Design a protein with these regions (language model features):
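Charge/polar-rich, low-complexity and marginally structured segments
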Residues: 49, 55-163
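A positional/architectural concept
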Residues: 1-53
């Protein structure tokens, strides 16, 4: 159970547990978004594992980054990029988000090396995932967004090197 004042991820958005309400036999977290003003959420405690998770520890982040090398990535059907990407993003699982980002990073790098432009729909998802992960890394590791971006880029580079 999370505690009042704790920073958590709700659908991979940073939020603070502002209150734990007990009413009519049910218990719910009242969350305040740390990313947008006047945005709050109510999450039943019994429902918390669906969309609510702890901020990842440094050890968890390192493990996720190390696992990138053996992660096969996500197969993206070129005629259904939105559908493929949304299916991965909806469960709000960091490991799957990193797996998709790895695939998009490989596609982006290949396009750049071939002198092509990165497909617009993939570029959009690459930006969304990168921004979200940089925000999470910055909060979890108490570092600047620039440091988090460099760390993420280094992990992607290392995770896509052929062994």
């Amino acid at each position: 159970m999370f505690q009042t004042g704790e920073i958590v991820l709700y659908r991979l958005i940073l939020a603070r547990v502002s209150e734990i309400q007990k009413e009519n036999g049910s218990v719910r977290y009242l969350l305040t978004s740390l990313e947008s003003d006047d945005c709050s959420y109510e999450v039943p405690v019994e429902n918390r594992l669906g969309h609510l998770q702890a901020l990842p520890s440094e050890a968890k982040i390192r493990t996720l980054f190390q696992d990138l090398a053996s992660d096969p990535g996500v197969r993206i059907a070129r005629n259904a990029v939105d559908r493929c990407c949304k299916a991965v993003l909806e469960p709000y699982a960091l490991k799957q988000w990193l797996s998709l980002l790895k695939t998009l990073y490989i596609d982006k790098t290949a396009a750049e090396m071939a002198g092509r432009t990165f497909v617009e729909s993939e570029k959009r998802y690459y930006g969304i995932i990168t921004e979200r992960l940089i925000t999470i890394l910055s909060a979890a590791l108490d570092q600047s967004p620039k440091q988090s971006e460099a760390m993420l880029n280094a992990a992607l580079e290392a995770g896509t090197q052929e062994g």
